[in-house]
Amino acid sequence: MTTSPAESRPQLIDFKGRPRVVVTGVGAVTPLGRTARDFWKGLVDGESGIGPMTLCDTTDYPTKIAGEIPDFNPRERLDARDARRMSRFSQIAVTGGLMAIEDAGLDLESEDPSRLGIVLGNGCGGFPDIENGGRTVETRGGMRLSPFFFPMILPNMATSQVSRVLGLKGFTNTVTTSCAAGTQGVGDALEVIRRGAADVMVSGGTEAGISQLGLGGFSVMKALSTSNEDPTKASRPFDAKRDGFVPAEGAGILILEKLEHALDRGANILCEVTGYGVSSDAFHMVQPDDEGEGAARAMAWAIEDANLKPDEIDYVNAHGTSTPLNDSVETRAIKKVFGEAAYKVAISSTKSMIGHALGGAGGMESVACVMTIVDGVMHPTINYEYPDPECDLDYVPNEARRQAVRKVLSNSFGFGGQNACLVFETYEG
């Protein structure tokens, strides 16, 4: 007996009756490389993208290292006029967006632009241009500012510029929830498709805030690593000798599609996004809730939203910032959610190799989660050398681990107690 096409077509809605959503393309501009594939290869190989800071003068600051994008030239993808009118965080977002659209094989001219949308996360906007603008006002006066100064620095301009370049005329938003923003960029885009407001969403996060403003602000908070002697060893999440995060920049972009739309155009489906959870600590401006209650809620809600149980998760891409407080609190939160299964699930931190790119971090980590499922390999947490009794789980230390990975949880926890988590799964039709 033959099966009709209608009978063989995959289920198009999830257990709550919402449209299923899949990932069909990724793009990344990162300290480990300017493409998603180079980024992923560096992660699997356990390379570090952290080195001496070159984007600003570090003379007066205790931290002199960063995760900077190597040899980034915006004119590889943008014309000269566009490049001049964009801040760096917008340039890398547009570059990543163009790559993601190409990876997805989307012919935008054949799509209804009102059904194409975008949500990007960003934390700092155009910090370097704000700093330079302040110098101009101080030395030459405010009337010597560029007429593009104000539109260049606004956090929503990356979203706006990607929309303009790609012709996205549907739902648009910018998420500014600090270190959780990139993950919320993906999660909020997921919800737009689930409620029927779009067929395709460009999603993720971008950040390029390396500047004296950022360096000084984080330094006086004592949030940054000062292990300048060997930059590649400075970011060491969950390690007993961790001393703060390493500032970084980068963008990670995912193309999310309604499953039905992806099938109709014969898209190559990389994986499925099945769960999203968001919570607030309501606790402190910069410190996480000591017991990880807010982080645990976001994880539990994301897993529940995916119709899973915690012990079904194969791998956790941790927030893992390399700060003394975050890593121990995140470990406690994982134990609250997973119970005894916490000691069996594999966990690793992308930030061990690229540093912390704030609003761009969750976008790059989401790309890493997609590639984890596609390639069946979990990248390591590098620089894990000295066990911390408060961080006693399996952090995939120092070497990648190859095994089938079907269900992944990604964590992002931002300043102000903003928590966001995503679940990615193997697409099985």
Residue ranges, per PLM feature:
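Condensing-enzyme catalytic core mediating Claisen C-C bond formation in acyl metabolism
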Residues: R20-T24, G51, E229-A306, Y315, ...
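Flexible, low-complexity linker/loop segments at domain and module junctions
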Residues: T2-V23, S110-P113, A306-E312, Y343, ...
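Active-site-proximal alpha-helical scaffold in enzymes
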Residues: A93-D107, P155-A158, S163-E207, F245-A267, ...
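ACP-dependent fatty acid/polyketide chain-elongation machinery
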Residues: T2-D82, A104, E260-L270, V367-I382, ...
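Active-site-adjacent elements of ketosynthase-type condensing enzymes
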Residues: T2, T58, P62-E68, G125-D129, ...
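Conserved beta-ketoacyl condensing-enzyme motif
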Residues: V23, D38-F39, V44-T177, T206-G217, ...
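Glycine-/small-residue-rich "gating" segment that lines the acyl/pantetheine channel
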Residues: T139-S146, Q184-G187, E191, V200, ...
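A glycine- and small-aliphatic-rich helix-loop capping segment at beta-alpha/alpha-beta transitions
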Residues: R37-V44, F127-G142, V192-R195, L215-N228, ...
